[in-house]
Amino acid sequence: MEQVQDEIWKLSTLDAWEMVNKNTEVVFDEIPEPETLSEMKRHPLYSNIFNADNNTTSFTEQIETSETSKTQDSEGNKVDKNLKENKSIRRKRSIDNDYELSNVKRNDITSGKNREFENEHHPASDTSSWRELPSIPTLEELTSKSVELPSNNIYGGYKSFEDYLSIHYRLLREDAVSPLRESVLRYKVNPNYITGSSLAVYDHVRIDGYTISSSVIAAKLSFSVRAKKKIKWATSRRLISGSLVLLSNDDFQTFRIGTVCARPLSGLNKHPHEIDVKFEDISISLDPREEYVMIEATSGYWEAYKHVLRSLQRLSASTFPMKDYLVHCKSNQETAKHIQNNPRIRINSILKNNSQKIVNALEPFGPGEYILDSSQLKAYQSMLTKRLSIIQGPPGTGKSFVTLKAIETLLENTHSHVLPILVACQTNHAVDQILIRLLHQGASVMRLGSRTKDPEIAAVTIFQKAKHTKHSFKAAYNEIRHKKQRLIKQITNIMHNFNLEFVTLSYLHSKGIITTSQLESLRNNTEWISSVAENGEKTEEELISIWLGDAKVELITPSEITDGFEEELQIDPEKLEEIQKEAEDSGALMEEELRGKFINLRCKYLFSKLTTLHEKEIDTLLTIPNIWDIPEYSRGIIYCRWLESAYAAAEKELNRLYRFYLKVDRERIGFSNKRAAILLRGANVIGMTTTGLNKYRDILERINPKICFIEEAADVLEGPIIPAVFPSLEQLVLIGDHKQLRPGCSTYALRQDPFNLSISMFERLVENDMEYTRLTMQRRMHPQIRRLVSSVYEDLSDYEITKYWPSIPGMGEIRRFFLTHSRIEDNDGFASKINLFEAQMLVQFAVYLINNGVEPQKITCLTFYAAQKDLIERLLSESLNREKHFIKVATVDGYQGEENDVVLLSLVRNNDRTEVGFLSSPHRVCVSLSRARRGLFIFGNAQLVAESNPLWWDAINTLMNDETIQGLGDHLPLFTKDGTIYVNDPVELLDVNMRLTRK
């Protein structure tokens, strides 16, 4: 027990709790709830976690503090539970208080800004080695029992540029490494661990061969799944391209690290399953008999981190032009150099009726027929002129439209020396949308990275451009290609010697492993052979098979025992596609299926090693001239010794060639980058994701970019944006909304104070009183719906057209309604939550709307929980035929940036413990309430959520205080031809729908 306690002490309370029931893992998609914590504290195995010193209880303190804050207001008082009696009560507390980043007082901002700046090149304490860390986790990182991390005080400036980089690098790296480290520890504590929401275990893992292509040498692994359930590989989070896997044959005392570089479904659906992995050590292992256990951390995704980490390591204070803003939080009033030199610009792109106008960009534009509202015009001018421009765009305010107009104006006025303009977004979809609109305006655009199904974008990817463009260094490039081909041929020739049922004695002889007499004895002892074999000449492989006799043991992978399908590691297909696009790029490593020559090393037999022989006896047997004189019971062990020597000799030569291969590949990449830079200089706008910005930073730096726009900037961690500040950069434009979803990170503790990793650069700068522009006129929500978020966006006004959105057929004048109920939630058996009553009500209400003429594609069903999303999708499929089932179902986290006419929102949470989980997050609540244009219908426990968060309180108060239209009740009003019907049960709604369809 002491050993187990010693191993587990460093786990967070969440991870410790996941191991209470041996192989049956209880996992959470949010922090543990009070009853869970209480049970953990009573459990003897985990008592040391809660009774340790302050450092080891920080996780617990954070969790308990977080839970307490969910149900208390700013004075620590419980919210009055009686909504009916307190309709007129309104919180005086500002909603901004609920967005506070930590307990640091606002005066810390001022004190931080007044710090005396240190030497920019002075290294941060205890961080001298961070720039030398390798691109993959080290053995020490993955097995260490303690990790020292820097705090990240987001109020005020950093001590120095080095301190700034070091903090973000180390926190990002820990976010990437932590899931892997905890996976290793979890396996060590319980080697019989089956699976869970953050760790997957695979058995009987063997290297079956290698695919050798022009860009990678990848091992094909065969394996079985320990989950005891069938895997829906097409939508599983398991073994995604770019994920890291760890292989070990000694219970993870040591292990090899590999990157999944291909996951063809044809291979995954086999038994044993197959994937392609690139090992990160410069080593090729040939022995297919060696069996490993493989684990992966499914809660993190290494590919999303590694390019950012590498970019941060390469930044230098002497070539970073925006230290004053980003490091020291100085005022961002400076004008961009290119506009300072020539402030007179044409602004035709924002004028009505094809008008033309030249203005001084540094002065107010004055009256005119603009297609922008006043706040958009202010944001537009900021984008054109400021070195650092920060634009907050609340829902529906047209921030992407303003961005497009600013880029069009820059293209119309800017001299070629400041082109091309970089545009980076969090998602591939957002990048493609901007580029398509610019294409339609006649801009010369190019897309970096990502395969795409859109033909317009496909035509402007750098891969397509390169295919049709000649380059001046073709001869040098061809020389590198020929070098690579020669190396590939040498490598494949060596491997082919093992692409046989048995490695021949001729090969063993050629390597000096057996003697000439031993080789000849195999071929010449025909008398012995004829006594055990039938007619005819025998090949050398057949002779070896005869010689081995019963020492051959056929290799059989045990069958998998499965019961049902795995659900906990499923992922939304759109999200999976987005992740895969980030891992893949044309002509690069990550592929659905690798292109190249495959050398099959899979062996049919194992060879019996059972022997009571001592090493001296084995050494004697190895020298017997006639191998037929070796006793049959010893032949398996002797042949194994020969194989081990053969593998060792071949691997030594292969690894030598592999090092040359990698050296030549670096030359190839260097030429490819030069060629790409030449192509990119021909574009006016280059689009990519923020991951792509880091992946291709070496190329982009060659073209000396002057202007960079970051869309969705509040939804991106600070680390990936820092490298966007190229040495040549004159202007950085950040567009986003810090009131909506924050960036995601893998490790819960790192989101909290003092690490604050989930605070974006955008939010940090705004919170430090940096000047920013907020758009104030929304064009999405009907005013009735917009009022639900008025406590978040106090100055948000409505564009005139929103007042005249058509009403919802079958709902009279009701555009927003909260159906409150007390039906208890349930657990889906894993981590997520479901509420069957809400799902059934939601589905039947959707059917009702369709029966009244609402088009299915204009309805979105939203929920905070993945399991509820899956349940709603299943019920919709059962209730609607394929022709009608075009209803979008999504989680709130997956729907930011989207909108629809009608949104049906399932809150799920309903329990007697007053726990609401995700519903306590004001950022998620803000997103959920601001997606609908014409109708928003909420299903949940109004009393419960009102107590959880001031934003819910204000929204529910708004619904209750509307004297003209009912907004909240325990019965849902339906306006039918037969009159108004009130329902509060799915069966009642089903009955209404059946009557409607009969008519």
Swiss-Prot record:
Entry EC no(s): 3.6.4.13
Example of a GO MF term: ATP hydrolysis activity
Keywords: ATP-binding, Cell cycle, Chromosome partition, Cytoplasm, Helicase, Hydrolase, Nucleotide-binding, Nucleus, Phosphoprotein, RNA-binding, RNA-mediated gene silencing
GO terms of biological process kind: chromosome segregation; regulatory ncRNA-mediated heterochromatin formation; siRNA-mediated pericentric heterochromatin formation
Sites bearing Phosphoserine, chain numbering: 94
Record's subcellular location: Cytoplasm; Nucleus
Keyword match Metal-binding: no
EC category: hydrolase
Residue ranges, compositional bias (Basic and acidic residues): 70-88, 106-124
Record note on quaternary structure: Cid12, hrr1 and rdp1 interact forming the RNA-directed RNA polymerase complex (RDRC). The RDRC complex interacts with the RITS complex via interaction between ago1 and hrr1. Clr4 has a role in mediating this interaction.
PANTHER family: DNA2/NAM7 HELICASE FAMILY, NFX1-TYPE ZINC FINGER-CONTAINING PROTEIN 1
Descriptive protein name: Helicase required for RNAi-mediated heterochromatin assembly 1
Protein source organism: Schizosaccharomyces pombe (strain 972 / ATCC 24843)
